[in-house]
Amino acid sequence: IIFMFQKEVGEKIYSKFPSSKYGRLSIITKYRLNIVKKFFVSPNCFFPKPKINSVVIHFIPKIQKYYKIENLKNLEEITNIFFSNKRKMINKNLKKILNMNDIKKIGNLDLKLRPSDLEPEIYYKITDLINKR
């Protein structure tokens, strides 16, 4: 599947961890898709000429996923909870949705990190723990 997006939106989709553009869109799309940035499109390619640049992105469905998330809606909700307070530490949000035993199952996790400091796999683990309840 190939789509064209506004450059800024596209950067949020294909950004990798860690980067300043990394966030909800990156995490959710990368769960199901391999994402390949193809090329940028100049505003001069359109009439009337827009004030923005565009990017073409190729989405390739993943055949094998390392995490099996049964309810993708939970991943959307979890990333929404964390990234709505992007500059806050994860400890309060994590304690709202998981008990201490579940938090320990995630592994060696520093609760003073911010949402953008967590790799996508951590969000997949959290979602998996929520789904198993």
PLM regions and their residue ranges:
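Class I S-adenosyl-L-methionine
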Residues: I1-P120, N131-R133
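Short, Lys/Arg-enriched alpha-helical microdomains
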Residues: Y123-I126
